């Protein structure tokens, strides 16, 4: 707002000098009227009140450590160097149980021949590993 045009004006566009006095002209102080006369404004601005949704109990939910096949493909040679995997018959043998990983997911590309041992595989991960000439071994 251009304030220059209010220079020399006593009330700067606020009407008479009484109009900007007190809290009554602005509907109360602070959060007053939040559930009464300011509620309509809050609804129009999209604020929401109260509880929403559902929170799952911690006993029900569990965190699964995962890895994507694309990451496995990139890290295969590094894992061999570190002694966490081995190469047999031209295939990288990776046991994910020893690494503390429970599930293999299918994001990424597989270019190497991988033989992966894990508790769980997603359908796309299993498909990509087997299409590249590798195999998936279910650990129990």
From Swiss-Prot:
<keyword id="KW-0687">Ribonucleoprotein</keyword>
<dbReference type="GO" id="GO:0006412">
    <property type="term" value="P:translation"/>
</dbReference>
<dbReference type="InterPro" id="IPR027386">
    <property type="entry name" value="Rbsml_uL15_N"/>
</dbReference>
<keyword id="KW-0694">RNA-binding</keyword>
<dbReference type="Pfam" id="PF00828">
    <property type="entry name" value="Ribosomal_L27A"/>
</dbReference>
<dbReference type="InterPro" id="IPR021131">
    <property type="entry name" value="Ribosomal_uL15/eL18"/>
</dbReference>
<comment type="similarity">
    <text>Belongs to the universal ribosomal protein uL15 family.</text>
</comment>
<dbReference type="GO" id="GO:0019843">
    <property type="term" value="F:rRNA binding"/>
</dbReference>
<feature type="region of interest" description="Disordered">
    <location>
        <begin position="1"/>
        <end position="32"/>
    </location>
</feature>
<dbReference type="InterPro" id="IPR030878">
    <property type="entry name" value="Ribosomal_uL15"/>
</dbReference>
<comment type="function">
    <text>Binds to the 23S rRNA.</text>
</comment>
<comment type="subunit">
    <text>Part of the 50S ribosomal subunit.</text>
</comment>
<keyword id="KW-0699">rRNA-binding</keyword>
<dbReference type="InterPro" id="IPR036227">
    <property type="entry name" value="Ribosomal_uL15/eL18_sf"/>
</dbReference>
<dbReference type="InterPro" id="IPR001196">
    <property type="entry name" value="Ribosomal_uL15_CS"/>
</dbReference>
<protein>
    <recommendedName>
        <fullName>Large ribosomal subunit protein uL15</fullName>
    </recommendedName>
</protein>
<keyword id="KW-0689">Ribosomal protein</keyword>
<dbReference type="GO" id="GO:0022625">
    <property type="term" value="C:cytosolic large ribosomal subunit"/>
</dbReference>
<dbReference type="GO" id="GO:0003735">
    <property type="term" value="F:structural constituent of ribosome"/>
</dbReference>
């Amino acid at each position: 707002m251009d304030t220059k045009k209010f220079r020399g004006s006593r009330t700067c566009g606020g009407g008479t000098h009484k109009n900007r006095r007190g809290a009554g002209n602005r509907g109360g102080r602070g959060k007053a009227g939040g559930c009464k006369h300011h509620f309509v404004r809050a609804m129009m601005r999209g604020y929401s009140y109260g509880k929403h949704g559902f929170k799952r109990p911690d006993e029900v939910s569990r965190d699964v450590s995962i890895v994507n096949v694309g990451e496995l493909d990139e890290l295969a040679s590094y894992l061999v160097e570190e002694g966490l995997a081995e190469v047999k018959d031209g295939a990288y043998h990776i046991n994910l149980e020893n690494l503390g990983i429970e599930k293999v997911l299918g994001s990424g590309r597989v270019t190497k021949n991988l033989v992966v041992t894990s508790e769980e595989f997603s359908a796309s991960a299993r498909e990509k590993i087997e299409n590249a000439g590798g195999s998936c071994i279910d650990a129990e």
